């Protein structure tokens, strides 16, 4: 079972990614496969919650450029701007994901 929480009250340094914009874009583009809060309910679609922003940014840019290929992700990433990628990566990185053993106390 997974629990996801967003750290509220975090401020962004000047020029940093816009987490709010990232949430909006991710909801529109990514949530169908990767879940509304980055926890996938789809087989073969990885969880994105709590992944490091630098990792997500690099992978999305690799899909966009063709350096990395996937039937769906290459098409999804192609029109994304650097700013949109940074924003979505920051959104997913801002999420926390706690993984519990099956049957563990809640």
Describe every region a protein language model picked out.
Residues 26, 63, 91-92:
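Conserved hydrophobic/aromatic "anchor" residues
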Residues 68, 78-103:
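C-terminal capping alpha-helices of c-type cytochrome domains
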Residues 9-13:
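N-terminal signal peptide c-region/cleavage motif recognized by signal peptidases
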Residues 23, 38-68, 74-79:
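Gly/Gly-Pro-rich "capping" loops immediately C-terminal to redox-active cysteine motifs
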Residues 17-37, 49-51, 101-106:
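Sequence/structural segment immediately N-terminal to covalent heme-attachment motifs in c-type
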């Amino acid at each position: 079972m997974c629990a996801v929480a967003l750290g509220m009250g975090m401020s962004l340094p000047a020029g940093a990614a816009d987490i709010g914009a990232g949430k909006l874009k991710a909801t529109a583009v990514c949530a169908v496969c990767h879940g509304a809060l980055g926890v996938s309910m789809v087989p073969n679609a990885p969880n994105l919650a709590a992944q490091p922003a630098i990792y997500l940014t690099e992978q999305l840019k690799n899909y966009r450029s063709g350096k990395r290929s996937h039937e769906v992700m290459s098409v999804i990433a192609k029109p994304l701007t650097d700013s949109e990628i940074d924003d979505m990566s920051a959104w997913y990185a801002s999420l926390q994901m706690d993984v519990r053993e099956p049957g563990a106390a809640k």
